[in-house]
Design a protein with these regions (language model features):
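Conserved, well-structured functional cores that handle cations and Mg-NTP chemistry
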Residues: 1-152, 157-174, 191
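An anionic, glycine-rich sequence signature occurring as long contiguous blocks
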Residues: 77, 96-120, 124, 128, ...
Length: 237
């Protein structure tokens, strides 16, 4: 059962006060705090927001931290010794905040090395999961917890995953992830690439929106809508 907004805010204030006087006998439960803070965030930001899946890298010097290995980090813009975390954020016109997180464990260097996992404090039952699989676990969990999102967004890593799309379709949840330009879709009964669909959109049907500040200034994107895959059995995709 979800707490009321006032009850959550009162509990949040009590947790904040308790944080000023640490209890040495208390057990840290990151998931419980995530759930409590998540409820507080949604109460403050309001319903009908967007769930956003994305990953970020944490550059490391050593090799002992859980999940660390040489891999591409978007944060660094190159291959680095780093950890990768997959995050779920919630955004509305009132603001944005993180709701959940999962640590990505590279298959061959972590789940396949139980001694290394034990040394880093990784639970023995943890199995390998792709980044989209981590997202597929987080999004339904947030919705089941009562997050009243209207749609889900993410980059191409997540947009190309059929399981994540299937889960969202089953829940009749709108989604606008990035996909590869060569992805095949059905347009008026003809199979074409996503890039070809974009070429059919005239300038007058494109709407430019700013997506925050980038390293080289404001990031502007042109948006348009096209009806694709209309023959899906449930008419929803």
């Amino acid at each position: 059962m979800r707490s009321t907004g006032s009850a959550r805010r009162a509990r949040w204030r009590s947790h904040h006060d308790a944080g000023l006087r640490p209890d040495r006998g208390a057990r840290w439960d990151a998931d419980a705090i995530r759930d409590d803070v998540g409820g507080f965030v949604v109460d403050r930001l309001g319903p009908d927001g967007v769930l956003i899946v994305d990953e970020t890298g944490f550059v490391k010097k050593g090799t002992g931290s859980a999940g660390v290995q040489r891999q591409y980090s978007g944060t660094a813009g190159r291959i680095e010794t780093c950890q990768i975390g997959v995050f779920l954020a919630y955004a509305t016109p009132a603001g944005r905040a993180l709701l959940d997180r999962r640590l990505y464990l590279p298959a061959h260097t972590w789940p396949a090395a139980p001694e290394r996992c034990q040394a880093a404090g990784v639970p023995g039952e943890i199995a390998f999961a792709t980044k989209p699989a981590l997202a597929t676990a987080m999004v339904p969990a947030a919705l089941n917890a009562g997050v009243l999102a209207r749609w889900v967004s993410g980059d191409e890593v997540y947009g190309q995953d059929p399981r994540l799309r299937a889960v969202l379709q089953e829940r009749r949840m709108g989604y606008v992830p990035a996909i590869a330009g060569n992805r095949r879709v059905d347009l008026d009964g003809v199979q074409v690439s996503a890039a070809e669909v974009a070429t059919h959109v005239t300038d007058r049907h494109r709407h430019r929106h700013r997506a925050g500040q980038g390293a080289k200034g404001p990031r502007w994107y042109a948006w348009a809508r096209a009806r694709i895959d209309q023959d899906e059995p449930d008419g929803y995709r």
